A protein has these predicted regions:
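Amphipathic alpha-helical assembly segments used for oligomerization, scaffolding, or translocation
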Residues: 1-74
C-alpha cells in the first residue's frame, strides 16, 4: 500500500515539476518582443499539447522509473 502512495506522490510531484517548466517557457514566449501575438499563441498551444501528452505519460506510469522516462520525453 505504501508503494502505491509513493507512486501517486511521485506522479503529482512530476506533474508539478513539468508544469513549472512549461510556465517558465510560456513566460519566456510572452516576454519575447520578436514574436507576434499569433506566433506566441501558436507556440503556447503546441507547448500545451506536449504538456498534456506528458501528463498522460506520467499518469500511465507504473513505476518511478517510468515517471522519469515520461518527464524526460518532454
Amino acid at each position: 500500500l505504501q508503494d502505491i502512495k509513493d507512486l501517486v506522490k511521485a506522479k503529482e510531484n512530476a506533474k508539478q515539476d513539468v508544469d513549472k517548466q512549461v510556465q517558465a517557457l510560456i513566460d519566456e514566449i510572452d516576454r519575447n518582443p520578436n514574436l507576434t501575438d499569433k506566433e506566441k499563441q501558436a507556440l503556447k498551444d503546441r507547448i500545451n499539447q506536449i504538456l498534456q501528452q506528458g501528463h498522460n505519460g506520467i499518469n500511465n506510469a507504473m513505476t518511478k522509473e517510468e515517471i522519469e522516462q515520461a518527464k524526460a520525453q518532454l
